[in-house]
Design a protein with these regions (language model features):
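Acidic helix/loop or adjacent segment enriched in Glu/Asp that either coordinates divalent metal
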Residues: 63-96
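Hydrophobic alpha-helical segments at protein termini of multi-pass membrane proteins
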Residues: 1-4, 8, 13, 48, ...
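A short acidic (Asp/Glu
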Residues: 33-37, 111-119, 145
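Short acidic, S/G/P-rich loop/turn micro-motifs used as interaction or catalytic elements
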Residues: 29-32, 52, 75-76, 108-114
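Short glycine-rich phosphate-binding loop at a beta-alpha junction
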Residues: 23, 98-107
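Short, low-complexity, polybasic intrinsically disordered segments
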Residues: 105-140
Length: 145
């Protein structure tokens, strides 16, 4: 699976105008391999050039064991997404300081969805770790990469 080249992403962002907007998001999918459950975590960085032109998307998929016991309330997997997004934000922080940045979480606050079980925890974690108020579904388009 392809890994993000952080230096390449930073160089691309630095070459853009200050009006360029950055969106960082993530998603995951759970699936079985044999008797064990795994999750593919997709991380995305969308660089919206000048905030009005085209965009360049950088992405990475990480596969890990999924230890969640409740498929319909995937707290551990969803928080793992959030931790990975915060880590990615911090890797890019030095080139993001003077730019408009949004963090998009694949979490739906509607209680009909399993992801609603972590809304407050996830939003609080991103606010505390990144000093950014994250977007959640349905406004979190970068979390649907």
């Amino acid at each position: 699976m392809k890994k993000l080249d952080i230096d390449e992403v930073k160089a691309f962002i630095e070459a853009q105008s200050p009006e360029t907007k950055i969106y960082i998001g993530g998603d995951s999918e759970r699936f079985p391999i044999g008797n064990d459950w795994y999750a593919d975590y997709t991380l995305a960085i969308v660089v919206h050039i000048d905030g009005k032109h085209g965009a360049k998307v950088f992405g990475e998929v990480q596969r890990e064991r999924d230890w969640d016991q409740k498929k319909n309330r995937p707290r551990m997997r969803l928080m793992n997404e959030v931790y990975k997004i915060a880590e990615l934000y911090h890797k890019l922080h030095d080139v993001l300081e003077d730019r408009q940045v949004e963090i998009h979480l694949d979490i739906n606050p509607d209680e009909r969805y399993g992801s609603s079980c972590v809304v407050q925890e996830a939003v609080g974690y991103i606010r505390g770790m990144c000093n950014v108020v994250p977007m959640v579904k349905p406004r979190a388009f970068a979390a649907s990469y």
